[in-house]
Amino acid sequence: GGGLLGNLERILNKRYSFLLERKNLFSFNIKLFSYLMKQANLTEREMLKTFNCGYGMVLIIDNNDLQEVSKILNKLNQKFKIIGKLKSTSGDPEVLVV
């Protein structure tokens, strides 16, 4: 449980927070998630804490590996997109929508 935010928070260690790019939220099916948000009267944050928002899997990889991982995913006909990045933190790890 915990939706996309909860899933991302669980994999963070104490040194990093995750910056989730707002422009990529719900992008696999914006109409569906906008409809759900409106019908359920949910905020963006509540949506992200409740649903995975179309993301079946999140890979966190080193930027140096992006080209190779992209090649592999393309070869497997897997759709993917970059949805954010890690940021060093001295506080508690968290997911921030930016």
Descriptions of predicted regions:
Residues 1-98:
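Glycine-/charge-enriched secondary-structure boundary and capping motifs
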